[in-house]
Design a protein with these regions (language model features):
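Short, solvent-exposed beta-strand edge segments and adjacent coil->beta transition regions
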Residues: 36-40, 74-78, 129-133
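Extended, compositionally biased flexible segments
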Residues: 21-52
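Core segments of cupin and vicinal oxygen chelate
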Residues: 1-29, 81-116
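Short acidic/glycine-enriched loop/turn segments that link adjacent beta-strands
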Residues: 17-19, 36-37, 105-107, 129-130, ...
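Residues at or immediately preceding the N-termini of alpha-helices
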Residues: 1, 46-48, 86, 141
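Short hydrophobic/aromatic beta-strand micro-patches
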Residues: 42-46, 82, 135-139
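Ligand-binding pocket scaffold of soluble enzyme catalytic domains
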Residues: 9-12, 87-90, 121, 138-145, ...
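Vicinal oxygen chelate
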Residues: 45-81, 102-116, 122-125, 146, ...
Length: 194
């Protein structure tokens, strides 16, 4: 948690049971649960229900996403599912999303929960490890990469421009790969425009 607090400027609060939360002002940016490695993404739903594979949907206020305020520096601002073999139909069916294929390797998941469809998440075909990867808002991708190195993290993918905006992939000294996105205008960077 100290690494990401140093990179994103989070205020860290210790919770009972060895967990920690990272805050940007009055908004929760992340929670580190003792004994759980990597990032876990939570999607809000209309009502609690059981999903396949033991997953669940819970109600609650959306902290981050297309209907939340514009992401501040250090807050989650996008999420992508990195997979070798996409199964877009699963996510669309389980979460009530639409799928918009942008290219052979990339698709957008959209939700019309609160009006017209908005991008909620992306899916990228990759040969790297599979899973949900969070993006965090930063003022400068270049300066963030320098800070990552100063704190003994690694830059896995150097800064580059992708349809979402200017990004880089980074990882802390103890894991937790994520992507940093420079000054997103909304959830999903350029995808927030629609």
């Amino acid at each position: 948690m100290d690494f990401f607090a140093g990179v994103f400027g989070w205020t860290v609060i210790a919770d009972p049971g060895g967990s920690f939360t990272g805050w940007v002002g009055d908004r929760l940016a992340a929670q580190v649960v003792a004994g759980h490695g990597g990032w876990r993404v939570v999607f809000g739903g209309d009502g609690a229900r059981e999903l396949s594979g033991g997953s669940g949907v819970d109600t609650g206020r959306v902290l981050h996403g297309p209907w939340a305020p514009v992401p501040r520096v250090g807050e989650p601002c996008w999420v992508e599912l990195m997979v070798a073999e996409p199964d877009d139909g699963y996510w669309a069916a389980e979460l009530g999303w639409e799928t918009r294929v942008e290219s052979e390797d990339f698709a957008l998941f959209l939700s019309a929960r609160h009006g017209g469809p908005r991008p909620v998440a992306g899916r990228l075909r990759t040969s790297r490890s599979s899973g949900w990867v969070p993006y965090f808002a930063v003022d400068s991708v270049e300066q963030t990469c320098v800070r990552v190195s100063e704190l003994d993290g690694r830059v896995l993918v150097e800064p580059l421009v992708v349809p979402t905006g200017l990004v880089a992939s980074v990882v802390g000294p103890h894991g937790g790969e994520c992507v940093v996105l420079e000054r997103p205008a909304g959830w999903g960077g350029t995808w927030s425009a629609g």
